[in-house]
């Protein structure tokens, strides 16, 4: 095939968003991406009676990915903790973690295998991969190497990589903005002016995982230690009962003075139900607040009594702040942007990611807030001048906006632009 046409790109651009918890993937033709958990199960320590029933090709690979496939073999593996591998921490795989890279390669293979192509005109996928803005250079190289290796198994025409916050800005058609991407592992605050302004990148070492962790501790306190061990159950409870307070102290005061108003139940299965009792109704607000600001006495007491840790971490030359609140992170990010363009960049703050997907139950509008309102209130308290000039909004699809931006980027990026390690732009063409 000669020149790749726009019509071709509208069919065969393929987006992959490698998140800490989920990989979202699929061609540009989808309304929304497919999702698979970012994990893999190594088939080690298997009893002989189990090995006999596993297909030889699966056994030979020694590794399975895909939600159904992992569940299928999970009960057969003796040491689940050793053999169930989550390759990304804060969106980054360690350079020397061979098992993590095996899982990422298998996930890349799995995502492409879901979309076989029989079109005789098919010259290969245009793959646009979104990685954490914290991803170091070695991770870019390793991802390119993975797709180089897969090119012999799947037709891949070219591969490009972009940072997740830039993908969100593209999906939102925002040229000047601050993207606040809240994932499971971390929160990335990234100023954008046509491209990512790396000097202004601020990262927080918390996200949806910390909301899960405090939910787990609350479940233990109210007598559901068995359920607290199951990550799936914890996630469901968090989503169902977690609340973001407008202001934490006022919300706790309201819940303690009228606990019946905040009592709730969650049915996890036909035979399992979780009830948040009156004396713990106020803790619902801690679940949402920990994402926005963990600097409260009530949250710190849970941290001290549990294995939950909120502390700084370092990835490459970037410090991830554990206790910095989201509003302070936005202000810090903007201070590192050239004064000349600060006001333009600050004109809109766009929230994205599952960590910002919170709802306000009917009748609780006086004490609970959605993410946009919570950030506005915090900015008004920290910087009234900034708050008066900025529009804060949530993307329409918080979980999918990175993938959507990736496929738009892959569709629009000129194929004449070859990859540059310096600018981190362009296409890499697999060795043929």
UniProtKB/Swiss-Prot annotation:
Belongs to the actin family. SMART domains: ACTIN (SM00268). Belongs to a conserved five-gene operon within Thermoproteales denoted Arcade (actin-related cytoskeleton in Archaea involved in shape determination). It is an enzyme of class 3 (hydrolase). Its EC number is 3.6.4.-. PANTHER family: ACTIN. It catalyses: ATP + H2O = ADP + phosphate + H(+). This is Crenactin. It comes from the Archaea. Its main location: cytoplasm. GO terms for cellular component: cytoplasm; cytoskeleton. Forms the backbone of an actin-like archaeal cytoskeleton, which is involved in cell shape determination. Has ATPase activity. Shows highest activity towards ATP or GTP as nucleotide, and only residual activity on UTP, CTP and dNTPs. Monomer. The crenactin monomers polymerize into right-handed helical filaments, with 8 subunits per complete turn of the helix. Forms single-stranded filaments under high salt concentrations and double-stranded filaments under low salt concentrations. Interacts with arcadin-1 and arcadin-2. Crenactin polymerization is inhibited by interaction with arcadin-2. Also significantly inhibited by elevated antibiotic A22 concentrations. GO terms for molecular function: ATP binding; hydrolase activity. The gene is cren-1. It is found in: Cytoplasm, Cytoskeleton. SUPFAM superfamilies: Actin-like ATPase domain. InterPro entries: Actin, ATPase_NBD. Pfam families: Actin (PF00022).
């Amino acid at each position: 095939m000669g020149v790749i046409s726009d019509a071709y790109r509208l069919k065969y651009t393929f987006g992959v968003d490698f998140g800490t918890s989920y990989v979202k993937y699929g061609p540009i033709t989808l309304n929304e991406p497919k999702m698979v958990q970012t994990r893999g199960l190594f088939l080690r320590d298997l009893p002989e009676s189990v090995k006999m029933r596993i297909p030889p090709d699966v056994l030979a690979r020694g590794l399975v990915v895909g939600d159904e496939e992992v569940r299928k073999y999970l009960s057969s593996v003796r040491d689940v903790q050793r053999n169930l591998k989550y390759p990304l921490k804060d969106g980054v795989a360690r350079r020397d973690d061979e098992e993590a890279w095996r899982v990422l390669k298998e996930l890349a293979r799995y995502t492409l295998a879901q979309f076989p192509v029989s079109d005789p005109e098919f010259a290969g996928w245009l793959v646009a991969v979104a990685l954490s803005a914290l991803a170091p250079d070695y991770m870019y190289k390793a991802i390119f190497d993975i797709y180089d290796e897969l090119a012999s198994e799947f037709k891949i025409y070219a591969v490009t990589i972009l940072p997740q916050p830039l993908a969100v800005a593209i999906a939102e058609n925002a040229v000047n903005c601050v993207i606040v991407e809240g994932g499971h592992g971390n929160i990335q605050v990234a100023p954008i002016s046509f491209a990512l302004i790396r000097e202004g990148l601020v990262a927080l070492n918390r996200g949806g995982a910390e909301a899960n962790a405090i939910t787990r501790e609350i479940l233990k306190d109210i007598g559901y230690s068995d359920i607290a061990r199951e990550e799936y159950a914890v996630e469901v409870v968090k989503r169902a009962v977690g609340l973001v307070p407008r202001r934490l102290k006022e919300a706790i005061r309201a819940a303690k003075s009228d606990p019946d108003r905040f009592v709730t139940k969650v049915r996890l299965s036909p035979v399992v139900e979780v009830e948040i009792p009156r004396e713990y109704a106020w803790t619902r607000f801690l679940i949402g607040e920990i994402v926005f600001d963990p600097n409260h006495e009530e949250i710190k007491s849970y941290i001290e009594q549990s294995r939950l840790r909120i502390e700084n971490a370092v990835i490459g030359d970037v410090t991830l702040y554990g206790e910095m609140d989201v509003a302070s992170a936005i202000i810090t990010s903007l201070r590192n942007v050239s004064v000349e363009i600060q006001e333009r960049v600050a004109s809109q703050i766009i929230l994205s990611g599952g960590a910002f997907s919170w709802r306000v139950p009917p009748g609780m509008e006086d004490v609970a807030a959605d993410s946009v309102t919570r950030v506005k209130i915090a900015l008004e308290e920290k910087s009234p001048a900034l708050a008066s000039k900025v529009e804060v909004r949530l993307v329409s699809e918080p979980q999918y906006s990175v993938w959507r931006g990736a496929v738009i980027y892959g569709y629009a990026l000129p194929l004449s632009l070859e990859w540059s390690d310096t600018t981190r732009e362009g296409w890499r063409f697999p060795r043929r």
